[in-house]
């Protein structure tokens, strides 16, 4: 970098050739596994309510979703994949759009618990029950103020700890400070797939 200062990035960029230190979740694999689980449960019409389309993590999650569909010979229109800011209102709005499709999805994968809460509100408004009428899998960053820590979690989730990613990032930064000449390192974390009551 121009300032010649050590740094570590949480996440990755697909648009740079310069090597740098990073820690990231294996987003492609996480959303492949989530979509594959829904397919194994018998779902064939699966929506994805994703983050902003130009964000690296969202692109990788869409790739995982599409790969699972392709490997199971499931073809879905582009309308089943939506993008937007990861907010509760966007989760709500995009869920309603999916539910208004001629063949609405029986399952949805989404990028955050905040958006999942919006999906849940949309289901309530349509008098549909989460987990019974529509299955939902969300990504969970394991943030304490959104913790889904019931004995049986509300949401089935791909869970990856932001706290652990922060610890690993700090370790990488200390290594870079101690040895400025060391080659940059990337750490790719696998998310856990946690079963909750939102899938059937």
Question: Whereabouts are the PLM-identified features?
Answer:
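Short beta-strand elements in bilobed, periplasmic/extracellular small-molecule ligand-binding domains
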Residues: 48, 66-92
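Flexible loop/turn connectors
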Residues: 96-97, 101-200
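Hydrophobic alpha-helical segments within soluble ligand-binding/sensing domains
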Residues: 23-48, 63, 88-97, 116, ...
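Conserved beta-strand scaffold positions in the cores of enzyme catalytic domains, especially
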Residues: 7, 20-22, 48, 81, ...
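Flexible loop/hinge segments that line or gate small-molecule binding clefts
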Residues: 1-33, 114, 140-155
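Residues that mark the start of a beta-strand
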Residues: 4, 45, 106-107
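Hydrophobic beta-strand scaffold residues
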Residues: 7-8, 76, 130
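An alpha-beta-alpha
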Residues: 32-72, 185-198
């Amino acid at each position: 970098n121009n300032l010649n200062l050590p740094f570590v990035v949480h996440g990755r960029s697909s648009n740079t050739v310069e090597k740098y230190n990073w820690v990231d979740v294996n987003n492609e694999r996480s959303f492949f596994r989530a979509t594959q689980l829904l397919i194994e449960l018998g779902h064939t019409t699966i929506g994805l309510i994703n983050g902003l389309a130009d964000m690296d993590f969202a692109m990788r999650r869409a790739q995982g979703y599409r790969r699972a569909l392709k490997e199971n010979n499931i073809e879905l229109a582009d309308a089943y994949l939506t993008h937007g800011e990861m907010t509760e209102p966007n989760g709500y709005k995009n869920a309603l759009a999916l539910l208004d499709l001629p063949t609405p999805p029986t399952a949805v994968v989404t990028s955050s618990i905040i958006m999942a809460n919006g999906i849940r509100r949309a289901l309530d408004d349509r008098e549909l029950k989460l987990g019974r009428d529509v299955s939902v899998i969300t990504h969970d960053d394991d943030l304490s103020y959104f913790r889904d820590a019931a004995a049986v979690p509300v949401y089935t989730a791909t869970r990856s700890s932001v706290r652990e990613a922060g610890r690993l990032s700090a370790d990488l930064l200390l290594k870079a400070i101690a040895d400025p000449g060391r080659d940059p390192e990337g750490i790719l974390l696998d998310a856990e797939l946690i079963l909750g009551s939102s899938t059937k």
